[in-house]
């Protein structure tokens, strides 16, 4: 919710009719309730709901990558200090995420790879 409020600049301005604790619950509620609005990741939007156009721009992977669809945020991985100063396990994880196999996993779970 924090990212939604921050990106739309509506923090402390929303009166939520109902707060749900899972993506599936949000999709089901929005699909069943005329006029409902919910927020979920792009990869789970299905034909039961419609993704919001923002300033006339469709919510697509290409538009997100191009910076045209601004209602998105990156996932980040962080360490205390440089990756090269971390344990071998942590370094192995970062190397995997950047590898072709890691990118395949990222795409497989519906996330958008950075350019």
List the predicted regions and their residue ranges.
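Exported/periplasmic ABC-transporter solute-binding proteins
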Residues: 1-115
């Amino acid at each position: 919710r924090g990212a939604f409020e921050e990106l739309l600049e509506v923090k402390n301005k929303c009166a939520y009719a109902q707060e749900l604790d899972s993506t599936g619950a949000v999709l089901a509620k929005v699909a069943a309730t005329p006029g409902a609005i919910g927020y979920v990741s792009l990869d789970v939007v299905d034909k039961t709901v419609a993704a919001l156009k923002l300033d006339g721009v469709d919510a697509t992977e290409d538009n997100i990558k191009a910076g045209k669809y601004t209602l998105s945020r990156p996932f980040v991985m962080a360490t205390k200090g440089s990756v090269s100063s971390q344990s071998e396990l942590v370094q192995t994880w970062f190397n995997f995420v950047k590898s072709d196999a890691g990118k395949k996993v990222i795409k497989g779970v519906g996330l958008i790879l950075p350019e």
